[in-house]
Amino acid sequence: MLHWLDAIVIPFLQSLYGAMGYVGVAVAMAMKGRPVQTRASRQEDWGVTTRFRPMAAGTFKAAVDAQGYPIAMEVHNTGADYAGDQQIRGLTSPPYWMPNYRYAHHKITTHVPVMTRRATGASPNCFYMESFIDELAHAAGKDPYLYRRELIARNPNGKPGVGGVNRKDDWLKALDMVAKMSDWGKPLPEGWARGIAIEDRRRPSRPHSTIGAEVVTVEVTKDGTLKWHRVDIAFE
């Protein structure tokens, strides 16, 4: 018979991607026969020794052809430098075809201690790029899914020092799959909309990484609030 109030041991441990998991294992081994729950209090998780995700900002501008596809793009982003290439991930070699692409990153110094917090540097950079691609598709009057697909399909296979995109077929497969899963193109009720995005966690030194595509179906309610109805995700 288990007496739950006496049998469950709840040590308060730091929780960052399982980095303190070995402590939980040690506690569990010392408390054999009892389930061990590991968690961190808010004060411990965000205590005086914590590091924060850095603030970041980016600017984008592009020149487009007669069909609305980019022929040149210039991207600048800035943020506190940490953990090597974190701040430039996702922007050094986007999957989209652009005959002319210029990227600059500006490091800043801050008194706030910074580091990854629940995600990597590619998170804001993905938001920047995908938001801008949406703006370009809207300006061109094109479907954002098909606009992305065309730009990825046009991009040649990646070559060192030349550009292009590695695993192009996988990018297209993930994009097509999430569009199919979400019934992309199917009419929605009034006030509803779908959004689509695709990225990976590439680093300059690691060109192959998991590709993730996502479609979110939302509704703007009568009182102006945003309601999420569905999220479809495809990984390749």
How should these model regions be labeled?
Residues 33-82, 188, 194-195, 202, ...:
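Phosphate/diphosphate-binding loops
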Residues 54-132, 234-235:
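Glycine-rich loop/linker segments at domain edges
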Residues 35, 158-193:
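Amphipathic alpha-helical
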Residues 37, 59-63, 70-74, 97, ...:
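Structured core elements
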Residues 2-30:
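Small-residue-enriched transmembrane helix starts and helix-helix packing motifs
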Residues 28-31, 79-80, 85-89, 117-152, ...:
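Alpha-helical support elements that line or immediately flank enzyme active sites
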